A protein has these predicted regions:
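Exposed acidic/polar residues on beta-strands and adjacent loops within beta-sheet cores, strongest
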Residues: 1-155
Length: 155
């Protein structure tokens, strides 16, 4: 079963996968979690947008690298509403998901380290993630996904 669908300039338009949401202007592509995640009566979907790390200096530090941000949308009619964004992979900040460093083919598009739970989702980091932690939990609070411990930054 296909869980993450490529979208963007080469992968096709966003409307076919997440109607009502367009990529950020600087995004070079995206992966859409095709699953709908429920928290209470609300439904959510994750969109992973890919950006160049150092677009203004492609020969410099991380010039060929990428930054990936997870955008979480509340699937509210008539248009999805963004409820959070988290940096999940970064050449510049040396942050990455555990699943993207598993050494398997296509692991760069493996977002299985984002695990949805009853009140939000947990991210398992490769090595030490933001703030030196190995995992971070984000919960839905007052309409936004926020870290559940103050030591975990919402990057």
């Amino acid at each position: 079963m296909l869980i993450w669908t490529a979208a963007g300039p080469e992968g096709g338009g966003m409307d076919a996968v997440l109607d009502g949401v367009t990529l950020a202007a600087a995004a070079t592509g995206a992966f859409v979690d095709t699953r709908v995640h429920r928290i209470g009566k609300k439904r959510f979907r994750a969109l992973y947008q890919v950006f160049d790390s150092n677009a203004s200096n492609p020969m410099g530090h991380c010039g060929a690298g990428h930054e990936i941000r997870m955008f979480v949308y509340d699937l509210t009619s008539p248009k999805p509403i963004e409820r959070g964004r988290i940096l999940v992979s970064s050449c510049l900040e040396s942050v990455s998901l555990a699943s993207q460093n598993a050494g398997r083919p296509y692991s760069e598009s493996d977002f299985s380290s984002v695990i949805w739970r009853g009140d939000g989702f947990t991210i398992e980091w490769w090595g030490n993630g933001p703030g030196g932690v190995t995992s971070s939990h984000y919960a839905l609070r007052n309409g936004r996904f926020v870290p559940t411990r103050s030591s975990e930054g919402n990057r």
